């Protein structure tokens, strides 16, 4: 049986892929990060699941402003637990 979280990850990844292939094609490329935010979302969803993937993506989007220099911002290898702070 397929888990609900797997289905949600698939659906979100599908919609982001539609955005990447059909909608962003008509918009000028101005992403200041590598990988792009849409690719970052797909990677974080696949690696950490729905909740943590969305949180990581939102935190990434908060960095997207003119005062941030951008550059390489990869999905973390692991997320720190509260006990590691």
From Swiss-Prot:
Q: What's in the keyword line of the UniProt record?
A: Cell membrane, Membrane
Q: Does the keyword Transferase apply?
A: no
User: Where does the signal peptide begin and end?
Assistant: none
Q: Membrane topology per the record?
A: Peripheral membrane protein
The record's listing under InterPro entries reads: Membr_insert_effic_factor_YidD
Q: What GO CC annotations are associated with the protein?
A: plasma membrane
Keyword Cell membrane in the entry? The reply is: yes
Entry-linked Pfam families: YidD
Where on the tree of life does the source sit, at the highest rank? Bacteria
Q: Where in the cell is it found?
A: Cell membrane
Its function, per the record, reads: Could be involved in insertion of integral membrane proteins into the membrane.
Regarding protein family, the annotation reads:
Belongs to the UPF0161 family.
What PANTHER family has UniProt attached to this entry? MEMBRANE PROTEIN INSERTION EFFICIENCY FACTOR-RELATED
Q: What is this protein called?
A: Putative membrane protein insertion efficiency factor
Q: Which organism is it from?
A: Buchnera aphidicola subsp. Schizaphis graminum (strain Sg)
